[in-house]
Amino acid sequence: GLPLIFSLYNKFKSVEEVRKRLVFTTHTPVKAGNDIVPLKLLDEMNFFGSLPLAEVKDITKTEGDLLNYTLTALRFSKIANGVSKIHQGVATQMWGNEEGICPIVSITNAQNANYWTDHYLKKHLSTNQIDLLIERKKELKQELLNEVANQTGKLFDKNVLTIVWARRVTAY
């Protein structure tokens, strides 16, 4: 996390040396998702190690009494990743005019199909065995519904269309 920045700065006494070692992934390009915390509170928690507060404000380019975690990470990183092209564009629009930030590029979160794809589903799909494919999907759905029941006590029928949303909704 962010204390790593100050630990590295304490060690090397150079923002440039910290930048050589730090890459940041920005996950939330909406204002509400980026923590801004009182410097005094962080100092009382020894967040900055042995650095005096005046030096922290100077190296982070912080004006006022609040530290923006994301902006600090962007200023101390050699590069930042947005987790998609859209995310990169929104993050660049959001932070791009700030002084001293690193470039923000896009990366795509990798998916390992061999790990995440069921062997039998893949086999039945590739051999066009639709009946076996449907049967296997129902077996896997029942496994999932059993897990849901074990964790929540809620029972669902595998023969009923069940729609779930497992991703947070973003503003961009």
Range-by-range predicted roles:
Residues G1-Y172:
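Catalytic cores of carbohydrate-active enzymes across secretory and cytosolic contexts
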